[in-house]
């Protein structure tokens, strides 16, 4: 039998034909991993078609051997769509969808049918979320907006009770806990990557991080993506696919429900399907109490970024996590008179000062003189303090040790031992519980030179809300936000526990500026970028903007137009990176 294969060669897009001799042809199927010889080298390749008609007059070489069971046929087909949608290599997606270890090929029977749960999900558990369980699993995409304090496990259990369910989470720890909880409920479930072989056999629910979007799950009955707004679901290396996008397409092709769960759904999710949320009282009760400290009127006698409300919390004896995210930040300037943050008049992002003394926007590159747009003064001061300096200030103020926690590590052996911890946003991802979370300089998030800055800021507040007790608890926790922009929509949404209010305004703003998801965007960079964008067909609705920092932006009204244009353009030799749906612009 003649098969068509995709060689595992970086940058190679050509598919080749090989013959599978007897008796192996009885075992071969789409997705299987085989060894081939190509140009004197032995390479691995994935079978993407079986029983093809080879071109006339061409000698077909045999495959060397059947190497391993690979992605299920429907997943192998999905990678063809993924290569088009994310303008990348199909072989890279096939590698992502493959087992981390070799699985010996053998005759495959029908997938076992999942038995009914020995301990079904309680309707009261789903009802406690303020949702109607009967409406959750309608065909298509459902965006489930639940507050930070709500446990999403009942949704997962309800889905798994219907049959094998694919569950995608941002973090491995959450995935492991969910897989164990499904098992304790009498539902068959495996975690990735260790459970890939069992998942390939079928009949069980599959739980994993973003790579689970390409994992086997047969027969698939539902797809659930938890915290769909989390950037950990996006693959940074090319092709830069997003697990949420893959999950939506996979569910569509399989004809099963897709649930996107989040306390603050992304605009991409909101545009993909209907929104289900609890009543306002229930949703608000699941958000924390958010105290906003207006830093425009900071006490000059206190050290920088230490306000009177923060000092009161620190001296209360409570467990406090202080967040100051300096990694990769732009320089911030504030008026020495009124204290207003220096921001771009065009897009609202923070501005820095170039060598000539002018103020330059880090997002849109607009240039303006050194003048406060609020009071007209020409004297600006730097607003910058690092985590280490803040730790020293806090230790002096409260008279006890303070731990420092960043993505690179902690200042001590155990970052959870001290009562007060200060760190970057890594702290709220590595610590499970606190009485209070304080964002010392939230302006960094609100005015960052990124088009998603507001959305990302709200996501941080939601994450902090999971560390502290909600406002409905007998002893509610608090989230303290120090900012010079207290009326920012993201802050107001967290204070009121109403993320829908933020989403409405954010959608309008991005549509006016031509940013995703209102427009489809790709970034093109590296040495071959100039040649590639020159070959794009821009006679229609395709826009090519740039270069800025040696990157070009390609923009179109929709993904069908954008991805079609990217696929049709010739690929020049040399390094080329195409990032579709970039998280940062």
Feature-to-residue mapping (PLM):
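Conserved segment of the helicase C-terminal RecA-like domain
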Residues: 246-268, 456-493
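Cys/His-rich short segments
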Residues: 306, 312-395
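Conserved RecA-like helicase motor-core motifs
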Residues: 185-195, 345-346, 354, 399-408, ...
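Accessory helical-bundle/CTD segments and flexible terminal tails appended to RecA-like ATPase motors
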Residues: 9, 102, 106-113, 122-124, ...
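Conserved two-lobed SF2 helicase motor
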Residues: 196-217, 406, 413-430
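Accessory, non-ATPase domains that flank or precede helicase/AAA+ motor cores in DNA-metabolism machines
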Residues: 1-288, 315, 436-439, 447, ...
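Amphipathic alpha-helical transducer elements in NTP-driven molecular machines
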Residues: 13, 25-28, 44, 72-76, ...
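Flexible beta-alpha connector loops of hexameric P-loop NTPases
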Residues: 230-241, 296-299, 379-383, 445-455
């Amino acid at each position: 039998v003649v098969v068509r294969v995709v060689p595992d060669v970086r940058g190679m897009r050509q598919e080749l034909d090989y013959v599978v001799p007897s008796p192996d042809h009885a075992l071969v199927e789409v997705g299987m991993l085989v060894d081939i010889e190509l140009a004197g080298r032995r390479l691995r390749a994935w079978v993407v078609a079986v029983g093809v008609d080879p071109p006339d007059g061409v000698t077909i070489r045999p495959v060397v051997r059947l190497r391993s069971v690979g992605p299920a046929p429907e997943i192998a087909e999905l990678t063809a769509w993924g290569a088009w949608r994310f303008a990348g290599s199909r072989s890279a997606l096939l590698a992502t969808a493959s087992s981390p270890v070799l699985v010996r090929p053998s005759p495959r029977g029908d997938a076992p049918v999942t038995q009914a749960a020995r301990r079904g999900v309680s309707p009261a558990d789903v009802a406690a979320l303020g949702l109607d369980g009967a409406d959750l699993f309608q065909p298509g995409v459902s965006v489930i907006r639940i507050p930070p304090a709500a446990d999403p496990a009942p949704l997962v259990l309800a889905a798994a009770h219907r049959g094998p369910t694919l569950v995608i989470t941002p973090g491995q720890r959450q995935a492991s806990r969910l897989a164990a909880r499904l098992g304790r409920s009498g539902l068959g479930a495996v975690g990735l990557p260790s459970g890939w072989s069992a998942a390939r056999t079928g009949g069980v629910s599959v739980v994993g991080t973003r790579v689970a979007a390409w994992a086997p799950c047969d027969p698939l009955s539902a797809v659930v993506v938890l915290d769909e707004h989390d950037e950990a679901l996006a693959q940074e290396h090319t092709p830069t696919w997003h697990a949420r996008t893959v999950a939506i397409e996979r569910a569509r092709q399989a004809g099963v429900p897709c649930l996107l769960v989040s306390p603050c759904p992304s605009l991409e999710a909101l545009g993909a399907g209907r929104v289900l949320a609890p009543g306002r009282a229930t949703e608000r009760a699941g958000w924390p109490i958010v105290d906003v400290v207006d830093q425009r009127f900071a006490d000059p006698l206190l050290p920088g970024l230490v306000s009177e409300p923060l000092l009161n919390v620190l001296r209360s004896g409570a467990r406090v996590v202080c967040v100051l995210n300096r990694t990769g930040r732009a320089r911030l300037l504030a008026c020495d008179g009124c204290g207003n943050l220096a921001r771009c008049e065009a897009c609202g992002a923070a501005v820095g000062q170039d060598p000539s003394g002018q103020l330059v926007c880090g997002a849109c590159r607009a240039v303006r003189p050194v003048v406060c747009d609020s009071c007209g003064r020409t004297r600006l001061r730097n607003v910058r303090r690092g985590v280490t300096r803040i730790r020293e200030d806090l230790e002096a103020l409260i008279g006890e040790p303070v731990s420092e926690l960043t993505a690179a590590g902690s200042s001590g052996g155990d970052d959870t031992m001290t009562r007060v911890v200060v760190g970057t946003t890594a702290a709220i991802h590595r610590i499970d519980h606190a009485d209070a979370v304080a964002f010392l300089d939230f302006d960094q998030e609100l005015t960052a030179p990124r088009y998603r800055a507001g959305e990302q800021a709200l996501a941080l507040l939601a994450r902090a809300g999971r560390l502290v007790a909600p406002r409905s608890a007998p002893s509610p926790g608090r989230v303290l936000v120090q900012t010079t922009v207290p009326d920012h929509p993201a802050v107001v949404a967290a204070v009121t526990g109403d993320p829908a209010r933020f989403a409405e305004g954010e959608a309008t703003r991005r549509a006016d500026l031509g940013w995703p998801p209102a427009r489809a965007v790709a970034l093109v960079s590296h040495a071959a970028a100039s040649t590639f964008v020159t070959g794009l067909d821009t006679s229609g609705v395709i826009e090519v903007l740039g270069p800025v920092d040696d990157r070009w932006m390609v923009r179109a009204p929709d993904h069908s137009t954008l991805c079609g244009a990217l696929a049709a353009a010739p690929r020049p030799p040399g390094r080329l990176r195409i990032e579709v749906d970039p998280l940062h612009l």
